[in-house]
């Protein structure tokens, strides 16, 4: 299977998604847009598209960030959805999926940084690929915004600070506002790059300290993500 990663910043890690793909021997390709790497020309280049997070918004312009082309990424997402590829968006990536499908990004009720529980909705509890997450499940977070909802979208998980943590947009299309891919190394990269943001955010409701983030064990969350990815891949192969 061919997995393509779109990464927006050097400090945004593919984390547990990369380990999953490597451990299963899948073919991995990259668009590290911060380094000038191009997006795939079309959806024929991959079976699964994973679009990661970043400090940008789907509304960020080329003038504001020359290496981030929101329109081009949304076009690629639309191509992938039309071609019935697996599409997963994380944080900014989930917001790009919503925008690509016509649903505007919006501000989350709360800023969340660190690890906090998500709760499965009734749809999530019944979902064959999500129900094994259990409810509640503590996962990683680092965001201000949340994805828009199309008429066909289904919210599968929410948190106290954000009502759109996991959204299904189609049979093989999922947006994760939360970060189940976080590892100790991935979080450390964000911490090192975000000193001022963390200092400014301390005291807000859903902000962990640096010490708490460094000490938390991300393994259980990663394992539940890997099972979701395995089951999604199996379902896609049987379509």
From Swiss-Prot:
What's an example of a GO molecular-function annotation for this chain? Answer: transferase activity
Supply the CDD domains for this chain: GATase1_1
Q: Which residues form the Glutamine amidotransferase type-1 domain?
A: 1-200
* One Pfam family of this chain: GATase
Gene3D superfamilies recorded:
3.40.50.880
| PANTHER family associated with the record | GLUTAMINE AMIDOTRANSFERASE YLR126C-RELATED (PTHR42695:SF5)
NCBIfam families for this protein? PRK08250.1
How is this protein named in the record? Putative glutamine amidotransferase-like protein YfeJ
Q: Which organism is it from?
A: Salmonella typhimurium (strain LT2 / SGSC1412 / ATCC 700720)
